[in-house]
């Protein structure tokens, strides 16, 4: 059984921007970028002005994302998202890895498939 890797990206989002953000990712997910990173599932969440982006992939997504930051599709998506998404902590944000939450606990039911 293949291990699923996860990354949770945390940022701020503009009020009312969820449909626009979802549309940008729907367009991007139809291209090659998810395959380059190994994304198998993506979920976007909103909690007030907090943007939560859960990536599930077949390999650790952090290093894979770092490898594609200069890819034209990544740059285009990132540029378009700046209209709606801003760093959670602008003082410490330097690259996408600075927006990734640190997983400190995981439990999985050993009997679940």
Regions found by a protein language model. Name each.
Residues 13-40:
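Short amphipathic alpha-helical segments
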Residues 15, 50-51, 57-63:
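Short, charged/polar surface micro-motifs in flexible loops or helix N-caps
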Residues 2, 40-48, 77-113:
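Glycine-rich beta-strand-turn "strand-cap" elements at beta-sheet edges
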Residues 7, 42, 51:
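A broad, low-specificity signal marking well-ordered, structured residues that form hydrophobic/aromatic
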Residues 9, 21, 53:
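Hydrophobic pocket/interface hotspot
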């Amino acid at each position: 059984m293949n291990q699923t890797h996860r990354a949770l990206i945390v940022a701020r989002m503009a009020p009312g921007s969820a449909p626009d953000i979802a549309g940008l990712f729907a367009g991007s997910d139809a291209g090659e970028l998810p395959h380059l990173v190994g994304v198998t599932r993506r979920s976007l969440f909103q909690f007030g002005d907090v943007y939560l982006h859960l990536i599930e992939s077949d390999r650790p997504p952090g290093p894979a994302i770092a490898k594609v930051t200069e890819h034209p599709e990544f740059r285009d998506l990132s540029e378009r998202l700046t209209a709606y998404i801003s760093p959670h902590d602008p003082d410490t944000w330097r690259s996408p890895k600075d927006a990734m939450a640190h997983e400190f606990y995981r439990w999985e039911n050993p009997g679940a498939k």
